[in-house]
Amino acid sequence: MHPSTVRREAERVKVSVRVRPLNERENNAPEGTKVTVAAKQAAAVVTVKVLGGSNNSGAAESMGTARRVAQDFQFDHVFWSVETPDACGATPATQADVFRTIGYPLVQHAFDGFNSCLFAYGQTGSGKTYTMMGADVSALSGEGNGVTPRICLEIFARKASVEAQGHSRWIVELGYVEVYNERVSDLLGKRKKGVKGGGEEVYVDVREHPSRGVFLEGQRLVEVGSLDDVVRLIEIGNGVRHTASTKMNDRSSRSHAIIMLLLREERTMTTKSGETIRTAGKSSRMNLVDLAGSERVAQSQVEGQQFKEATHINLSLTTLGRVIDVLADMATKGAKAQYSVAPFRDSKLTFILKDSLGGNSKTFMIATVSPSALNYEETLSTLRYASRARDIVNVAQVNEDPRARRIRELEEQMEDMRQAMAGGDPAYVSELKKKLALLESEAQKRAADLQALEREREHNQVQERLLRATEAEKSELESRAAALQEEMTATRRQADKMQALNLRLKEEQARKERELLKEMAKKDAALSKVRRRKDAEIASEREKLESTVAQLEREQREREVALDALQTHQRKLQEALESSERTAAERDQLLQQLTELQSERTQLSQVVTDRERLTRDLQRIQYEYGETELARDVALCAAQEMEARYHAAVFHLQTLLELATEWEDALRERALAERDEAAAAELDAAASTSQNARESACERLTSLEQQLRESEERAAELASQLEATAAAKSSAEQDRENTRATLEQQLRESEARAAELASQLEATAAAKMSAEQDRENTRATLEQQLRDSEERAAELASQLESTTAAKMSAEQDRESTRATLEQQLRDSEERAAELASQLESTTAAKMSAEQDRESTRATLEQQLRESEERAAELASQLESTTAAKMSAEQDRESTRATLEQQLRDSEERAAELASQLEATAAAKSSAEQDRENTRAALEQQLRDSEERAAELASQ
């Protein structure tokens, strides 16, 4: 009996279509409620109705023909999940119906050893994820569970049932990956930070092996023992899977997700000695694919990153469509097909699904569509691709090791023989027992050999992993040594930088010290300069104040002397009026003199007016052109010259008064000599008139003195103003020359007038006789004038008192000025103290800067020492690393020698096993031949027995 060949089954891809209910967006749209799809679940036919009208703004003109003709599509199964019954009146399909039709066969194929695949294809928002995962993956039971949790639940139930028989056990492993932007990410991989967006993606590479097929290198597979484990892992993967909200779907999948279930059988056999032998049995792989939905950018209105995601999704789905077209064309046309190789490698998705499409797999496809007219084009495109996929033919084979398959066949034969021995002929049973013992020994031997080979393979894999780990450790040590070398170099560079920085800090400190010393010298010089300037200003102000006080005292004394002279002269006039008489001519002369004095007073008033005008002109010039030191000097000179001219005019007036006094004395003597009462009366009148003139002159003198003080005050104000222009100087000089000329002209006129008065006084004697007639009238007038003179004397006394008060006020001003100057002196001293304190603080800052520099120097020296210590540590670590590297190389060489020896032993063992297998095959052939001979003999004996029994029965 020869071993059976590998079991292979060729069948096409099973395609199902599921029509979902209308969603909220479609119910709210004007044409959303128009259903364009009809289905007959019993006949598995989907009909796309004619789309009438032209109101659908989203329709493409290229689909016009398709809209006018209804199209029927035949599939393997149709699930109508719309609320209303289908065209045949069947009730809507549930999640349980989908599982019974698709999921249950997948579980059966998995335990039979066939690879299988289920992938959902359709537009975004058409119900793919709901069909595959359900409304809530965390819910372990309920009507809303999807195909995936139901498949896992059925796998664990079947696993428990098989393991209960005691011949084998099944191991289930789960993997979960996604294809996002043409990169494959392991959703169960160990992430450093653990959350999407905050942690790193764990990418894996897609590889292809001649015997294993397509696999993911570096993928993490987790063994699961219950549905709770599956749900937990799926929730972990969904937590890091890429999803987003679009106009078409609130939770749109932005990647293709693949759940991989790996089933491995482990068979057990007990020998006669009681030893348990474990061997590998069947294995299978199940891929549950939730494809991202195809979408039109105009409808989903995505942009930015979502636009990039939609582009990659549509490209991968387009590649999937091309693969389906090529495989379908190859299946239907054979050698006449246009393409002989499908473009699997154009996309990561199609590369992963290579075995599922046209390879070693039993594949199911479920296409999900929307019945709404809003999705007419997408629905029609999905149905066309699904219909095209039905033409793809896969050739699936059982995944089982030939030796394990042979052991399984021997076990099946032994089980058949055990059943044949029940109630049979003893001799036949004895023969069968012998053959059964031979088969059992052969099976046990093969199982032991297989177990030994598996252990040896596992040992070799362990050694290979150890070798790879050693190589990885070596490379890691080399990288660490290089990193340590770089770190030491960086430390040296840092030490050099710190040393250079220290030098720069020292230079900067020295530079700052020099700048600080220069700044301190500048401040000292500025302080000395300010102190000298303040001292000079104080001395100057003190001199000005003393000169002003002295001038005021001098003027006061002059005023007192003038007042005493006037009073003395008044008494003399009074005595002359009482003791003598004046003649009419003398009276006229005195009157004429009085008139001249009044005119002279008018002229003096004009002089004062001119001086005031000059002062105003000077003020205007100062306002227009500014003030300078030169203008102050000019103004002071002008004021001094005006004051000199004023004193000259006063002196001239006093001279005239003295002349008048002399004339009065001469008249009085003449009057005394003549003893003329009338003349005496006239003389009294003349004296009174003269007294009035003197009083007027005194008043004018006082006014002039007041104006002089005002002029002096103004001159002092002008002296305090420091800016003027050359034009002001020239104008002031010109005005001064004009004033000088005017005053000189007035002085000459006054001298001429004085000469006239002298001549008039000489003519007074001649007019004495003519004045006697008016003496009586004049006496009354003189008496009145005398009373006025007395009143004027009282006014002069009050003016004297006011002058005294002004003097006191001037003294107070002097005192206040002195206090102000003293305050300024104190302020200057305080400023000097502040500058001294600033100097002290600057010195303290300098000391602090020196301390900081010393501390910085100590810190840098400490860091330098630490860097040197670190460099020494790094050098020691480098030496130890080098020693460890050499030790690792020695270990690697010894491990390599050991592995090579083990490999040679394995090869020798394999040769022995091969020879044993050949001997076993020869013995097996001999045993089979003996068994055939025995069977033929037994059959002959059985026929003989039957003939004998027939004969006995006939007898």
From Swiss-Prot:
GO biological process, one term: mitotic spindle assembly
One GO location term (cellular component): cytoplasm
Coiled-coil intervals: 426-955
7 X 39 AA approximate tandem repeats: annotated span: 704-955
InterPro entries on file: KIF11-like, Kinesin_motor_CS, Kinesin_motor_dom, Kinesin_motor_dom_sf, P-loop_NTPase
Biased composition regions of type Basic and acidic residues, renumbered to the chain: 785-794, 824-833, 863-872, 902-911, 941-955
Kinesin motor domain boundaries: 12-392
Highest taxon of the lineage: Eukaryota
Broad class of the protein's primary localization: cytoplasm
Gene3D superfamilies assigned to the protein according to its UniProt record, in alphabetical order: Kinesin motor domain
Listed GO MF terms: ATP binding; microtubule binding; plus-end-directed microtubule motor activity
Entry binding sites for ATP: G122, Q123, T124, G125, S126, G127, K128, T129
Originating gene: KIN
Keyword Repeat listed: yes
Keywords in alphabetical order: ATP-binding, Coiled coil, Cytoplasm, Cytoskeleton, Microtubule, Motor protein, Nucleotide-binding, Repeat
Sequence repeat ranges per the UniProt record: 704-742, 743-781, 782-820, 821-859, 860-898, 899-937, 938-955
Protein family (similarity comment): Belongs to the TRAFAC class myosin-kinesin ATPase superfamily. Kinesin family.
Disordered: annotated segments: 682-712, 725-955
UniProt protein name: Kinesin-like protein K39
Subcellular location: Cytoplasm, Cytoskeleton
Alphabetical list of Pfam families matching this protein: Kinesin (PF00225)
